[in-house]
């Protein structure tokens, strides 16, 4: 990593269907090998499935799912005098969103439904109802931070 210049943030354009920047970021995370049209099909298909199952706006379900998965606190390793401590720190908003998206997709990929569209829609529905692997991951991270609360004075 360069010490001189920090990389400037790129502007992400909103997606064509919902006009939402977060959906675009989600699509980009689903994408493999630059195949954006495939990722687009998967994400829009999953949102259509959600709309068919719940009769609610798919965007509200998606936003609720992401909100339920995003962590507020995490642990980071800090080396102090030969010992490594897991120090709980608050998570920046950009990292919260990135982790939430990453965990949702990882949880969806680990499911047993037949197609990725079905897996993604099922995981989003579960997450919006505070269930599923992605929510469990968030709970585990929060538990870890709570368990290491004694080391919070090592924050930097």
Swiss-Prot record:
Keywords: Ribonucleoprotein, Ribosomal protein, RNA-binding, rRNA-binding, tRNA-binding. The keyword Disulfide bond does not apply. GO terms for molecular function: rRNA binding; structural constituent of ribosome; tRNA binding. Disulfide bonds: none annotated. Part of the 30S ribosomal subunit. Contacts proteins S9 and S11. Belongs to the universal ribosomal protein uS7 family. One of the primary rRNA binding proteins, it binds directly to 16S rRNA where it nucleates assembly of the head domain of the 30S subunit. Is located at the subunit interface close to the decoding center, probably blocks exit of the E-site tRNA. This is Small ribosomal subunit protein uS7. The lineage of its organism: Bacteria, Pseudomonadati, Pseudomonadota, Alphaproteobacteria, Hyphomicrobiales.
